[in-house]
């Protein structure tokens, strides 16, 4: 049971949400009085309450989603709130739906989407993983951050071949190393206001670090937003190489580290937007002609469930005709399907760019 103190904080938080007429988050949309009363007294075995779930969305009324999961159990204990949010965000993934088993598929069906190097500047595929038996950021203790780091570091440093590289802990990092990692665009900073409010930055920088291979085409973020963010990337459009590298790396890490997976929601992550495959496959691509007609660009992208952003992030424009284009769907389909849909869509966009006037 949540303590009386937590429940009274929750009552105040609920009132604040109700009075915020300019708040349009999914949290506000689905945290009805009925759902609130049903959940306000609950607490997970690891000590998480509804307050941990909603605090970021209450503090940041301009949130799009507004909720995070403090631990794996939260997705089931607070399902009355999470389920409708997940269904809304993941376009109809109903409480009765299930994430298919993990399936990376036949890597030989992937190709270099731009062999002439005319359009695609770079390609990147990432996934998130949580370690089984540990809560997510808001409920982690300092010692747990250190434990997770040491388990993962050992496994990463045993990698061989093209994955071989070095682990750089954020704690005690020298200025030179810091500068190099910033120049490579590898260094992550302490979380933004949404993550701060969700208490995702506790004991910073304890237990946080970055691993990258010598060729700088493979990267792992340890204890940033998720326990692990595993990233494969390179210049050009060779999706087969990029995805293949990610699949190999996940397999190596999995030999020693058990990941948190739910039968219905797939791989569990701190933010419900990343659930399921957790995969974001993206390219930076030059589409000057198509970009001049944004409506047409969005139309082709939507047909393949692709998200179009400027390269500076979510809400940025693209004055130079370069876009960050990625798969929108992560939940309710296999890893293979998510990446294949992105490949098909990119090929179609290149075709449309070539035929644009």
From Swiss-Prot:
Tree of life domain: Eukaryota
GO cellular component: extracellular space
Disulfide feature: none
Keyword Nucleotide-binding in record: yes
UniProt-listed InterPro entries: ATP-guanido_PTrfase, ATP-guanido_PTrfase_AS, ATP-guanido_PTrfase_cat, ATP-guanido_PTrfase_N, ATP-guanido_PTrfase_N_sf, Gln_synth/guanido_kin_cat_dom
Cofactor field: a divalent metal cation
Catalytic activities: L-arginine + ATP = N(omega)-phospho-L-arginine + ADP + H(+)
Binding of substrate, residues: 64-68, 225, 271, 314
UniProt keywords, alphabetically: ATP-binding, Kinase, Nucleotide-binding, Transferase
Entry-linked SUPFAM superfamilies: Glutamine synthetase/guanido kinase (SSF55931), Guanido kinase N-terminal domain (SSF48034)
Residue span, Phosphagen kinase C-terminal domain: 119-356
EC number of the protein: 2.7.3.3
Residues given in the record as ATP binding sites: 122-126, 185, 229, 280-284, 309-314
One Pfam entry name: ATP-gua_PtransN
Coiled-coil zones: none
UniProt xrefs under PROSITE patterns: PHOSPHAGEN_KINASE, PHOSPHAGEN_KINASE_C, PHOSPHAGEN_KINASE_N
Residues of the Phosphagen kinase N-terminal domain: 9-91
GO molecular function annotations of the record: arginine kinase activity; ATP binding; creatine kinase activity
GO biological process: phosphocreatine biosynthetic process
Family: Belongs to the ATP:guanido phosphotransferase family.
Name recorded for this polypeptide: Arginine kinase
Organism: Trypanosoma cruzi
């Amino acid at each position: 049971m949540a303590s009386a103190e937590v429940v009274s904080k929750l009552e105040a938080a609920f009132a604040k949400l109700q009075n915020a007429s300019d708040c349009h988050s999914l949290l506000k949309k689905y945290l009805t009085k009925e759902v609130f009363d049903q959940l306000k007294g609950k607490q997970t075995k690891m000590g998480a309450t509804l307050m941990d779930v909603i605090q970021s969305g209450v503090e940041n009324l301009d949130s799009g989603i507004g909720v995070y999961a403090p631990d794996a159990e939260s997705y089931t204990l607070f399902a009355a709130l999470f389920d409708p949010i997940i269904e809304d965000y993941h376009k109809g993934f109903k409480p009765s739906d299930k994430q298919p088993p993990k399936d990376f598929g036949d890597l030989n069906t992937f190709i270099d989407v731009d062999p002439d190097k005319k359009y695609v500047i770079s390609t990147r595929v990432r996934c998130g993983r949580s370690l089984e038996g540990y809560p997510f950021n808001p409920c982690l203790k300092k010692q747990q951050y250190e434990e997770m780091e040491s388990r993962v570091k050992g496994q990463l440093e045993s990698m061989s071949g093209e994955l071989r590289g070095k682990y750089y802990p954020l704690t005690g990092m020298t200025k030179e190393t810091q500068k190099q990692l910033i120049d490579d665009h590898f260094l992550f900073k302490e979380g933004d206001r949404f993550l701060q409010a969700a208490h995702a930055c506790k004991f910073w920088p304890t237990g946080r670090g970055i691993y990258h291979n010598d060729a700088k085409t493979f990267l792992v973020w340890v204890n940033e937003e998720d326990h692990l963010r595993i990233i494969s990337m390179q210049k050009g459009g060779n999706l087969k190489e990029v995805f293949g590298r990610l699949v190999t790396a996940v397999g190596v890490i999995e030999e020693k580290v058990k990941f948190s997976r739910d039968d219905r929601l797939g791989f569990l992550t701190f933010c419900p937007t990343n659930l399921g495959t957790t995969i974001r496959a993206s390219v930076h691509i030059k589409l000057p002609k198509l970009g001049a007609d944004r409506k047409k660009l969005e139309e082709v992208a939507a047909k393949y469930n692709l998200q179009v952003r400027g390269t500076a992030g979510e809400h940025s424009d693209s004055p130079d005709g370069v876009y960050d284009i990625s798969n929108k769907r992560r939940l309710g389909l296999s890893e293979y399907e998510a990446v294949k849909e992105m490949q098909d869509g990119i090929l179609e966009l290149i075709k449309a760019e070539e035929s644009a006037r």
